[in-house]
């Protein structure tokens, strides 16, 4: 047993010694210009993604949750394309604001307070959020008709995928399970 440990110790010392250059001239000269350029590109991408994700947090936690619609331009382009969970797509920030406002008519306490998962790649980011609220006001359904509130709370997992250009989203994909949402607020069995 001692001999096996001794052999292992000697092997470890050999590996450590061989990893240390004998003299300064043996040190690697650095990365190739191509590799250094790629490293800088990746670092720049990571910085941009971190900035975009920080903007995303501000969007959901503050702008959306507090209905600060005059600030939506901080995260969305003027001509943003938004793809909604029910399959419809809207064009332009004003239409997007109109749709967002409609969510608060029947659930004024709608809130997103957490992004447990967030990441990005290139010009894209994605966050998973948890949207909560209470169906506490009448829900307009068109033609002057309303669904009366049930008082039921909702707590749904949602995901947003955003394409960023010049520091704002020019395209946004929203995902959540509408059937689960409707069940939670008491409109589906």
Model-based region annotation:
Residues 14-15, 189:
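Hydrophobic alpha-helical membrane context
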Residues 23-189:
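C-terminal and inter-domain tail/linker signature
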Residues 8-11, 20:
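Serine/proline-rich low-complexity intrinsically disordered segments, especially terminal tails, linkers
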Residues 15-23:
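C-terminal segment of classical bacterial N-terminal signal peptides
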Residues 1-9:
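Bacterial N-terminal signal peptides that target proteins for export
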């Amino acid at each position: 047993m001692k001999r096996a440990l001794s052999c292992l110790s000697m092997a470890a010392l050999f590996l450590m010694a061989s990893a240390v250059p004998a003299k300064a001239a043996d040190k690697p000269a650095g990365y190739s210009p191509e590799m250094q350029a790629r490293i800088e590109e990746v670092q720049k991408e990571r910085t941009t993604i971190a900035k975009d994700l920080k903007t995303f947090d501000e969007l959901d936690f503050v702008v959306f949750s507090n209905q600060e619609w005059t600030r939506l331009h901080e995260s969305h382009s003027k001509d943003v394309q938004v793809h909604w969970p029910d399959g419809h797509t809207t064009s332009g920030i004003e239409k997007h604001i109109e749709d967002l406002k409609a969510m608060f008519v029947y659930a004024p306490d709608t809130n997103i307070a957490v992004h447990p998962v967030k990441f990005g790649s290139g010009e894209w980011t994605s966050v998973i959020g948890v949207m909560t609220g209470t169906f506490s006001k009448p829900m307009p359904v068109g033609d002057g008709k309303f669904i009366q509130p049930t008082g039921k709370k909702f707590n749904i997992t949602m995901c947003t995928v955003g394409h960023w250009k010049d520091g704002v989203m020019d395209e946004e994909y929203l995902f959540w399970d509408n059937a689960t949402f409707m069940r939670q607020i008491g409109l589906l069995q």
